[in-house]
């Protein structure tokens, strides 16, 4: 029996997981976790261990990204792509859309299906890795996501409420992992519109696999996660995150579109435009990322309450 003990307090029996995959009992391995929890490094080492067990010269497993912002080209430092970390392991659904466009969950579900079928069609093991709870559930639950039509009557009613009331109402209806949603009244109203629609029209499953995902969650203590976030933020600022945002603007990406992506791109853009000082930007951004990581964990705990079994490890 092969244990994967170097990357977690819970020894993962990778050979047993692989046997379950080969027997059709598991058809996808998913590594999820909040930001700065080490999930990418964990997923890469997992793929390497699968390759070793397979005894092949080429990678026997490939990674599908489950990140809502790493799809955009040119948004590298701010989204933490860290592509060098993948080494020889192939990855999918990174750098597939232009910065300034608005890639959505419907496109992701379609692209995930294509990547999954490509990987499994070549006899490789698919490993989904990411922290975007909505994207992960869209891929692993096989939901048939509806194209929600506008409800003008509901919109007019919600427009009468202030943004704080709308935030509270949305928080009661569904967890939000994209922090930029909560900063725009228009986007909150749209999210509420979708939530109310889904209550009246229950989401059904598609016929697409996977149906039996083995979930591995990477987590560290709250204190360590905060320290990692702060350290990584300073590293990214030193590596040129501000210059990256300036370059995107110089290449024609509208500041409003960058701010739409939230977190790093919202606050760094405001700094570049002179709206915030450097210290204000650094403080507000760090706080926003801390809150974002908390919401990610809330989403994953919600998955567990809905019946998903997540095997938690501490990288």
List each language-model region with its residue ranges.
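Phosphate/pyrophosphate-binding catalytic cores of soluble transferases and nucleic-acid-acting enzymes
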Residues: 3-315
């Amino acid at each position: 029996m092969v244990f994967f003990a170097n990357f977690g307090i819970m020894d993962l029996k990778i050979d047993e997981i692989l046997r379950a995959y080969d027997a059709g009992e598991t058809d996808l391995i998913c590594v999820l976790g909040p930001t700065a929890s080490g999930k990418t490094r964990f997923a890469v080492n997992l793929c390497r261990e699968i390759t070793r067990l397979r005894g092949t010269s080429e990678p026997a497993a490939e990674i599908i990204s489950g990140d809502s912002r790493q799809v955009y080209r040119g948004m590298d430092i701010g989204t933490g792509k860290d592509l060098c970390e993948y080494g020889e392991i192939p990855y999918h659904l990174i750098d597939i859309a232009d910065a300034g466009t608005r890639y959505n969950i419907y496109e992701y579900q379609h692209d995930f299906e294509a990547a999954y079928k490509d990987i499994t069609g070549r006899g490789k093991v698919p490993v989904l890795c990411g922290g975007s709870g909505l994207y992960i559930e869209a891929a692993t639950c096989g939901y048939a996501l509806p194209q929600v039509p506008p409800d003008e009557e509901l919109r007019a009613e919600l427009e009468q409420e202030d943004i704080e009331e709308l935030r509270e109402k949305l928080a009661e209806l569904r967890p939000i992992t994209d922090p930029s949603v909560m900063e725009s009244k228009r986007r909150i109203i749209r999210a509420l519109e979708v939530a109310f629609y889904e209550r009246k029209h229950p989401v059904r499953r598609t016929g697409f696999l996977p149906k039996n995902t083995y979930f591995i969650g990477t987590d560290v203590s709250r204190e360590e996660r905060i320290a990692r976030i702060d350290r990584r933020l300073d590293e990214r600022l030193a590596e040129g995150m501000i210059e990256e945002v300036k370059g995107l603007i110089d290449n024609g990406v509208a500041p409003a579109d960058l701010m739409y992506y939230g977190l790093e791109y919202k606050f760094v853009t405001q700094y570049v435009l002179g709206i915030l000082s450097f210290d204000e930007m650094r403080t507000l951004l760090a706080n926003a990322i801390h809150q974002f990581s908390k919401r990610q964990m809330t989403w994953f705990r919600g998955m567990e309450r809905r019946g998903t079994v997540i095997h938690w490890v501490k990288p």
